[in-house]
Amino acid sequence: MDAGGGGAVPARYRRSMIRETPGGEQIDPLEAQMSYPRGRPDRPWVIGNFVTTIDGAAVVDGGSTAINDDDDMTMFGAIRAVPDFILVGAETVRAENYRPIDLDERRRRARLEAGLEEVPHLVVVTRSLDLDPKARVFGDPKRRVTILTGESAPAERFAALSEVADVVRLDATTPGDLLHYLRMARVVLCEGGPGTWGQFVAAGHVDEMALTVSPMLVSGVSVRLAHGPAADPPLEMRLDRTLYGDRSLFLRYVRP
């Protein structure tokens, strides 16, 4: 795999300390992410991007903000330049107060050079449609969100959300149904939450895992990054690359 680590690091990444080896040369996270080979013939390539503490907590104080750092946010932004669609569950949209997807000029240019649209499209999954039409995520009419829901979704909420988003009823909202709806995509990035990602893991619809390990121990009863039915058999992943931040560790896993 091409690391894309040669040459000067662009100004927007100079605050980050992401390196190929501890104390080694800085790499450009965007170049690295755009260089990885991705794609499969039968369905979109699915990436999960998550941060966890050393002791496995994926949610602290209701979200992941407490365990992020600057390097993680830099890598998060680089990974967001990759997909056609960003898929996220409604609970995470509420907990993290999602905003409309936007990318800086450099990431937009990298996407256009790769044959992608300037900005990935945000897709929110919810069976209950328990979302506030006035939420920040719906604040940019030029970045209209798609909401995927099931046949039993409440009609009143469907009508209200249709004013600010494209709401689509599916026969079911299993990972297979979601990927079938998004079948024209090459890459889908799942940003959670743990329940949504757990369903993808259990269904075997995982191709890549971008995992940030934050140097914290929190104990408590926090859920893991994948929560729900067990994968049977467990999904075997291969460690493809390790990068080092000033504090955090970045692991890229792919299916063998």
Task: State where each predicted segment sits.
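Enzymes that bind and transform nitrogen-containing heteroaromatic metabolites
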Residues: 9-256
